[in-house]
Amino acid sequence: MSERIIYTSVFGGYDNVVEQSSDGWDLKCFSEETHMPIYEDNNRNAKKFKVLPHRYLKDYEYSVFIDGNMSVVGNLDELVDKYLKDSNVAFFSHNNNYLDARNCPYQEAQTILDLGAKNMKLTPERGMLNYKDDPYLIQKQMTKYSMVGFPKDNGLITGMVILRRHNEKDCIETMEDWWTEIKYGSKRDQLSFNYCAWKNNLKFNYMDGDSRDNEYFNRSTGAHIGKK
């Protein structure tokens, strides 16, 4: 067994999983075929494994989570050695995304709410399905963050790829808090990670480049085949 693993988590046929190959790395896909779903919401069923590798991958020191529609095209050993050298967690920054740069969960929340309201005018028959998540939960969550002093413009992750030394104490504590936010708040995990990192004083790194356009990962277009 390797000390390093690449894994993904797909429930409800949302992603057409891309086959992976990376020398020296074990591979795993969590799904309803390997683990019984607990929640009616496939998104949360998948994100439990995404967020909590310390519960399910204890025998590994390093993990790289990737969305099911992502493929590895670069040297992961090089990536992990670079970004987990002085921290136990690393993400791509949403602010480096060419198409939709944002640097704040509050901005992300407002974008989701604005898009939902726009869609509601265009297709009112879809009702709340016009929103990526329950707008009440999103607003409630952002209000809570503001009330406890979480600052604006404090960074925003993209959750497509996560590098972790997942058995380390600071990582475990932050991931458990992150899962609590996703479980009881919005399922949009980008809204809550930076808050949890701030709350736990977690040091983490941002990888260079656009999460959709970089030398290590490729995102397959049209790979989403189901509903979260």
Task: Indicate where each model-derived feature is located.
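Short active-site loop/helix that positions an aromatic residue
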Residues: 54, 77-81, 196-197
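Short beta-strand-to-loop acidic/aromatic patch adjacent to the donor-nucleotide binding site
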Residues: 61-70
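Short, solvent-exposed loop/turn segments at secondary-structure junctions
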Residues: 11-14, 34-35, 70-72, 96-98, ...
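A short acidic (Asp/Glu
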Residues: 16-19, 74-78, 216-217
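N-terminal anchoring/stem segment of glycosyltransferases
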Residues: 1-62, 184-188, 199-202, 227-228
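Short acidic (Asp/Glu) patches
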Residues: 46-51, 78, 140-146
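Catalytic core and acceptor-binding pocket of nucleotide-sugar-dependent glycosyltransferases
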Residues: 120-228
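Conserved donor-nucleotide/metal-binding helix-loop-beta segment in metal-dependent transferases, i.e.
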Residues: 72-114
